């Protein structure tokens, strides 16, 4: 199986690639290190994979994903043509969007329409979800764009809530919130969703 990850810019060093290579040696890891187009910013370059002429499912992951426990189940999660699998974002307070952009699995040919839609007006889509208040900038919104677009033609599936969580190593990741309270509430929500006391 092919797995793709984006590492553009200097926020994440080569040690992130090394980590994923060590964790996923039996997979075909592919790196997107340069923008596919000079207008396309950072994680929005994930859209490129949707344009590939492949008849097999692929995975695309965030470069900073941590893989623990029986993590290979994530990559082997079942999918059929016409489906799109994503990581749930259950920890958000606003539940109007359900996915997190840290993991997608799909058939690229099924998603070509999403790539075409994005490329038809790159500037509009890269700012749309920031301007309408769904997320904050300067660069964000790709997971919201993907979720809205997937729902136009595909069946959206999420992996089990108990397989994923969000963990922040410092308070900068959750601007405007009390860090300790956020961690506490997230832990309680996880326990409730998974019955994992």
Language-model features: locations:
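Substrate-binding rim/cap in mid-to-C-terminal beta-strand-loop elements of soluble/periplasmic
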Residues: 95, 99-109
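Conserved donor-nucleotide/metal-binding helix-loop-beta segment in metal-dependent transferases, i.e.
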Residues: 67-99
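N-terminal anchoring/stem segment of glycosyltransferases
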Residues: 1-43, 54-55, 108-109, 153, ...
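Catalytic core and acceptor-binding pocket of nucleotide-sugar-dependent glycosyltransferases
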Residues: 107, 112-197
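A conserved catalytic-core signature of glycosyltransferases
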Residues: 45, 99-101, 141
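Short aromatic/hydrophobic "clamp" motif used to bind/position activated sugar donors
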Residues: 58
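The conserved acidic donor/metal-binding loop of glycosyltransferases
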Residues: 62-66
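Short, conserved alpha-helix that lines the donor NDP-sugar binding/gating region
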Residues: 46-51
């Amino acid at each position: 199986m092919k797995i793709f990850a984006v590492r553009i810019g200097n926020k994440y060093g080569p040690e992130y690639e090394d980590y994923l290579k060590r964790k996923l040696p039996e997979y075909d890891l592919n790196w997107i290190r340069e923008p596919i187009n000079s207008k396309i910013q950072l994680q929005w370059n994930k859209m490129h994979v949707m344009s590939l002429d492949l008849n097999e499912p692929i995975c695309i992951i965030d470069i900073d994903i941590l893989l623990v426990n029986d993590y290979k189940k994530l990559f082997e999660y079942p999918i059929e043509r016409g489906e799109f699998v994503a990581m749930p974002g259950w920890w958000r307070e606003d539940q109007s969007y359900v996915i997190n952009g840290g993991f997608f699995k799909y058939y690229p040919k099924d998603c070509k329409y999403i790539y075409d839609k994005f490329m038809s007006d790159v500037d509009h889509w890269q700012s749309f979800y920031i301007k309408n208040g769904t997320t904050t900038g300067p660069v964000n919104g790709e997971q919201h764009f993907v979720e809205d677009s997937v729902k136009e033609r595909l069946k959206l599936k999420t992996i089990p809530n108990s397989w994923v969580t969000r963990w922040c190593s410092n308070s900068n990741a959750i601007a405007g919130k009390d860090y300790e309270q956020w961690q506490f509430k997230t832990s309680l929500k996880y326990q409730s969703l998974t019955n994992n006391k």
